[in-house]
C-alpha cells in the first residue's frame, strides 16, 4: 500500500510540474497562480501547496528535475576516462548536463527562472538555486578530473574541486548567453563551452 501511495504521489508531482512549466511559459511566472496550476494538473490547490510550499519552490523543483540526469550518470562518466581524452570527456559531461537541463526546462522557462532568482526578496533562493545547478555538475566534473589524475593524465597538483566548480561557472555564463541571445543555437552553445573547456583544462593535461 505504501508503494502505491508513493507512486500516486510521484504521478501527481509530475502532473503539477508539467502544468506549472506550461503555464509559466504561457502566462509568465508572476502572473500564474497556484490555483491555475492545480486546475490544469487536476489536483487541489492545497495539494500543490502541500507538495511544494510556494510557487517559487515549485519553480526551483523544475530546475532540480533537470539536474537529476547528471547525478545518475556520475559513476558512468568516471569510468569513461579510459576511452576519452580529458578535454573531450569534460566537455561531454557538460554537454550532457546542458541537454538534460534543456529537456526539463525550455529556453523561455529558463528566462523566468533567472528573473525569479534575481528579484526574489528571499535571501535563501539564490544559494539554493546555485547549489542545485552547480552541485551535480561540479561533482561529475570533479570525479572525472580525479579519475584522470589517478591515470596520470591530469596534473596531480591540480585542485580538482576548485577547477570543477570554475567550469560550472563558465558553463553558466554561456548558458545565460543562450537564454538571452535568441539567435544562438544549442550547437553554438556547445561549441562555445567546448572551446573554453580546452582553454581551462588544457594546461593541466599530461601524457598518461
What annotation goes with each model-predicted range?
Residues 1-11, 78, 208:
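N-terminal intrinsically disordered/low-complexity leader segments
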Residues 9, 17, 59, 63, ...:
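Amphipathic, non-transmembrane alpha-helical scaffold segments
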Residues 12, 55, 62, 66, ...:
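Hydrophobic/aromatic residues within well-ordered alpha-helical segments
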Residues 15, 19-57, 61, 65:
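Helix-turn-helix
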Residues 61, 75-107, 160-167, 190-193:
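Hydrophobic alpha-helical connector segments
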Residues 71, 84, 88, 104, ...:
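Amphipathic alpha-helical packing segments from all-alpha helical-bundle domains
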Residues 79, 94-102, 111-120, 199-205:
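Helix-loop "lid/cap" segments that line or gate small-molecule binding pockets
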Residues 108, 127, 131, 149-197:
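Hydrophobic/aromatic-rich alpha-helical bundle segments in the mid-to-C-terminal region
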Amino acid at each position: 500500500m505504501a508503494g502505491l501511495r508513493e507512486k500516486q504521489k510521484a504521478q501527481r508531482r509530475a502532473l503539477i510540474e508539467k502544468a506549472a512549466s506550461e503555464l509559466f511559459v504561457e502566462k509568465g511566472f508572476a502572473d500564474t497562480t497556484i490555483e491555475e496550476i492545480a486546475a490544469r494538473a487536476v489536483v487541489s490547490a492545497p495539494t500543490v501547496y502541500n507538495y511544494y510550499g510556494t510557487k517559487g519552490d515549485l519553480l526551483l523543483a523544475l530546475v532540480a528535475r533537470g539536474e537529476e540526469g547528471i547525478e545518475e550518470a556520475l559513476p558512468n562518466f568516471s569510468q569513461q576516462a579510459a576511452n576519452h581524452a580529458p578535454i573531450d570527456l569534460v566537455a561531454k559531461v557538460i554537454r550532457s548536463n546542458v541537454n538534460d537541463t534543456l529537456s526539463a526546462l525550455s529556453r523561455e522557462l529558463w528566462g523566468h527562472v533567472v528573473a525569479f532568482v534575481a528579484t526574489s526578496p528571499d535571501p535563501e533562493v539564490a544559494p539554493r538555486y546555485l547549489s542545485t545547478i552547480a552541485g551535480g555538475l561540479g561533482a561529475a566534473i570533479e570525479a572525472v578530473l580525479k579519475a584522470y589524475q589517478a591515470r596520470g593524465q591530469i596534473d596531480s597538483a591540480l585542485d580538482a574541486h576548485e577547477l570543477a566548480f570554475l567550469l560550472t561557472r563558465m558553463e553558466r555564463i554561456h548558458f545565460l548567453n543562450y537564454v538571452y541571445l535568441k539567435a544562438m543555437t544549442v550547437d553554438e552553445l556547445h561549441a562555445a563551452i567546448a572551446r573554453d573547456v580546452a582553454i581551462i583544462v588544457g594546461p593541466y593535461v599530461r601524457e598518461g
